[in-house]
Amino acid sequence: RGVYDKFKGQAKNPNLESIFKSVPFREFSFPFTFAPKNEKEKDSVHKILQLFRFHMLPEQQSGANGYFNVPSEFQITYMYRDNENSYLPRISRCVLKQCSIDYGPEGVVSTLTPDEKGAPPTLITMNLTFGETEIMTKETVAKGY
């Protein structure tokens, strides 16, 4: 049949239809680059990285083998100066789905002067991927989401 259709310059219409199944959860990625220049910045960057790694993971329930408390939720708001930026869509409550950190984004790890904890990197990239915890609908978009 394929050779005949090719000879005739035709293709069979498979009469396919698309059926609505569901709405996916929205995801948002935010890339960051850190280049600490001194001790204070190095400590601040380290705390920021640890903070996101900590809050993306669940907590094991005490005395409940195999059970976790859910990870932290985030409320992200796009700001312009001191106000919410209404030109960008609002983001509902999210969880941090992925936190990827690269301590050598240029292919090699370079460090500041070592201290008692080790040698802090001079350039770090971090990409955060957040996933909303609710499905968007026409009603939520009408509210600015």
What are these regions (language model features)?
Residues 1-145:
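Acidic, Ser/Thr- and Gly-enriched intrinsically disordered low-complexity segments
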